[in-house]
Each structure stands twice: as C-alpha cells, then as structure tokens.
C-alpha cells in the first residue's frame, strides 16, 4: 500500500511538472534562431513589422546583466547634445527594433534615446522571458549606465505591454536620475494576465496549469511568473507616471488600468484611447498619443 501511495505521489508530481514545463517552454522560452516564444504565434499581429531605423546617429551599447548575460541596446543621439534621456522598452515577443517609431518621435523632439533588447530578445542573450521580473533589473542597469555616462541626465522610462510592466517595476527600484514613467497597457501581474487569457489564447485551463507553471518557472529562471507583479510595487514609485490603455484591449484586461492607477501614490495621469486594442494606442491616434506623452514630460525638459 505504501509503495502504491509513493508511486501515486511521484506520478502526480511528474504530471504537475510536465504541465508547468509545457507552458513555460511554450510561453516563455526563446525559440530557435533568436525567434520569440512559440506562444507569440497566438498573440502577435503577423502583419506588424519593425518600423524604419531612425535617421539619427546611432551606436551599439552593451552591458553584462547581474546574472552574466550580455545585453544589447541601440543608442540614438539627437541633433543637439543635452541631458534628456528616454529608455524605450519593447513588449512580449518583440525586440528593440519594434520601438523605433517611438524613438523617432523622441529624437525629433531632442531626446537622447536608448532602445534595449530585453533578455531573450533581439541581440541580447538569455533563454527565458520573465515578463518583467528580471527585465526590470536589466533596465535599472541601463539607467545606471546612462547616469555613469551623463551624471546630469534626466531619464524617463517608456514601455509598452510587457515593457510597461517592466518600467513600472524598474521605477520602483528608484534608479538614479529617473524623472518620469510612461506605461502603455501594462498588466497588474503576469500571473493574473496569463490566468485571464489562458483558455482563450492557449486553449488551456487556469488550473492546474498556472500553479504548476509558476513552480517550473522558478526552477528554470530563478523567479516565478507571479514575481512579475507591478501592482505590488507601483505605490513605491516616487516620480510622475502616465498610465495609457486602449479601452478595447483584449489581451491585458482594460480594468487593470484602474487597478494600477488607483494604487499609485506618485503624481499621475491617465490617458484612455477609445477603440484601441492591445498595444494599439499609438497607432490608433498618433498625434493625440504623442501630444499627451510630451505634454506630460514637460517637467523633465
């Protein structure tokens, strides 16, 4: 009887690991030839291509992450030298090239721009995406590098989707010279977001998939999916935050906007783009989008 019980427990744990491992490999593991995770095929718009490279002087930057990964970023310089810096952070399954249209707008207005490839994306090393849990530490290090290069820098963080979650968590770490944050369609937590979308997007039930995936993610990456939780730290941010969300977002539920906004204690503004889906606020109305962003950032000039 005891042997049967032990065997049953082993089978149960093996099954739980297999379930969690399937999700982590499907949703978080980088594909072959630097491609995004397999799950991106279920989420990403296949017609969306990287915008043109901004027509401004550019150079490659690199740094080593706290856990030994070589990370890459593209640094663009405006026409006139100044102390204003924008770190633009891409979303899930993308790389820094997808932020080049945002970079163009900042550069035209005289900002220095740094566009990182987050870990496990683009030219940066890494096997797994962690939905902002570790990426936020990497962006913190990019901000630290900027401050070392330019001690008088005024740095803003602007992120979209997973990039938005990342910049919120980065801001809570209080990088030196941080001036403001723009978050566009960020989630309260990756765990909550995946749970809400699991059946619709991946055809999987929340239970037992998410609890098992949380454990396997911890084993494989050192952090849990639930560690990517901006809602838990947004009240620690001390600089002004602009919260942006499209009211037709089907991926990151629209109600997450108010949860984040209400929890924030720093000076804050909210910008809802009617009719915009996920990560589509800028494309829906570019003029209104960037007018709002740069009016908000006037205090960092």
Q: Where on the chain are the PLM-derived regions?
A:
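An N-terminal hydrophobic leader/cap segment in hydrolases
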Residues: 4-64, 74
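The serine-hydrolase catalytic nucleophile loop
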Residues: 92-105, 118
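Short alpha-helix in the alpha/beta-hydrolase fold that links the catalytic acid
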Residues: 102, 230, 239, 253-262
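Conserved alpha/beta-hydrolase
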Residues: 105-125
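Alpha/beta-hydrolase active-site loop
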Residues: 129-150
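Hydrolase active-site cap/lid region
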Residues: 169-223
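Short beta-strand/loop motif that positions the catalytic acidic residue
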Residues: 236-238, 243-245, 249
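Catalytic histidine neighborhood in serine/cysteine hydrolases
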Residues: 262-279
